Curated annotation (Swiss-Prot):
GO terms for molecular function: structural constituent of ribosome. The keyword ATP-binding does not apply. Belongs to the bacterial ribosomal protein bL36 family. This is Large ribosomal subunit protein bL36. InterPro entries: Ribosomal_bL36, Ribosomal_bL36_sp. GO terms for cellular component: cytoplasm; ribonucleoprotein complex; ribosome. NCBIfam families: rpmJ_bact. One of its GO terms (biological process) is translation. The keyword Ribonucleoprotein applies. It holds the Pfam family Ribosomal_L36. Signal peptide: none annotated. It comes from the Bacteria.
């Protein structure tokens, strides 16, 4: 999980979602692409 000020999709499988007011990126193909805004 990377914590970043600016979250962007890294690959085409990444999805940007908002969970409890926190913007997150989840990825089915590569778990290293997981990000959270913070």
């Amino acid at each position: 999980m990377k914590v970043r000020a600016s979250v962007k999709r890294i690959c085409r499988n990444c999805k940007v979602i908002k969970r409890n007011g926190v913007v997150r990126v989840i990825c089915s193909s590569d778990p290293k692409h997981k990000q959270r805004q913070g």
